[in-house]
């Protein structure tokens, strides 16, 4: 059984121990998965692309018709307080200057069970901060293995919803195969992975699926575009079919915790061609270097 750490968390206006945090069994997040979440990385205690995460939080809340319960400044203050408490406590043997993840969850709130959205309900707001689980040097050097699956999830992947059963089932497919991620296709076209966006490289250009209701617009969507422009790599969002992925020169993942991570094996077959077959490629390497620079310049 996992031990819940005795770290500071925020719940409905109060700070307290994560071990003691409780919500009502009638909370609609518990009953229906009726809520949204955000995961904001922090490097050396500084929040990375904070405003972009807040903008996506606003978009998700608007799609669920939930009013944002806090201002940007209030969110920033709470995030920084949780980070400072974690660093001070030295949770999980962390030291000052290490990296953290702030998890934010907002549900519609507590109401009698009914599928119809209730009026005049106060949202439940929960926040916690954890040490970031870093990608290992070996994973960066050798890349990771992924498997593929049909995208069997619901039609609103654009909402960062707490209703994640489809993603859980998808991620378990790769876990059962000892792989890092499950890359999914809907009607033969790439959507995303269970907990990552997916990018392919063809003839030196980075390609990704277009923004749609089937794909969560990861914060790294815009970041990858910016980094490609910075280092002179072509970038294009267009439909990417299954054959494009398996024929790609490179494949890589992006997410808050993976940052950019090369995929070197797909369904047991090496990714890429020639001398770089089954190895991280040069486009990934350039983007990783640019990402490292961005972590310094785009954190507050």
Question: Which residues make up each language-model segment?
Answer:
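Conserved alpha/beta cores of soluble small-molecule-handling proteins
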Residues: 1-182, 187-189, 221, 226-300
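Short, glycine/charged-rich beta-strand-loop motifs at protein surfaces that mediate ligand recognition
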Residues: 211-214, 238-240
């Amino acid at each position: 059984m996992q031990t819940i750490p005795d770290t500071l968390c925020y719940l409905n206006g109060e700070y307290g121990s994560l071990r003691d945090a409780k919500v009502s069994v009638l909370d609609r997040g518990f009953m229906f998965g009726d809520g949204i979440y955000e995961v904001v990385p922090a490097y050396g205690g500084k929040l990375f692309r904070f405003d972009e995460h807040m903008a996506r939080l606003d978009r998700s809340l608007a799609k669920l018709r939930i009013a944002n319960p806090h201002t940007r400044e209030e969110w920033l203050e709470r995030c920084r307080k949780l980070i400072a408490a974690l660093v001070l406590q030295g949770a999980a043997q962390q030291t000052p200057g290490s990296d953290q993840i702030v998890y934010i969850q907002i549900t519609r709130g507590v109401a009698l069970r009914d599928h119809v959205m209730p009026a005049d309900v106060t949202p439940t707001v929960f926040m916690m901060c954890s040490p970031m689980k870093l990608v290992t040097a070996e994973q960066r050097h050798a890349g990771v293995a992924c498997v593929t699956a049909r995208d069997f999830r619901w039609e609103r992947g654009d909402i960062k919803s707490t209703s994640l059963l489809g993603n859980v089932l998808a991620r378990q497919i790769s876990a059962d195969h000892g792989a890092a991620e499950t890359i999914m296709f809907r009607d033969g076209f790439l959507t995303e992975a269970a907990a990552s966006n997916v990018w392919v490289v063809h003839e030196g250009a980075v390609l990704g699926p277009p923004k749609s209701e089937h794909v969560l617009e990861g914060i790294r969507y815009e970041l990858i575009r910016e980094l490609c422009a910075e280092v002179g790599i072509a970038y294009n969002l267009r439909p990417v079919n299954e054959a494009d992925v398996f024929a790609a020169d490179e494949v890589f993942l992006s997410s808050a915790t993976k940052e950019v991570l090369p995929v070197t094996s797909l369904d047991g077959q090496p990714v890429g061609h020639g001398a770089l077959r089954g190895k991280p490629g040069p486009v990934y390497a350039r983007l990783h270097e640019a990402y490292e620079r961005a972590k310094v310049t785009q954190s507050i």
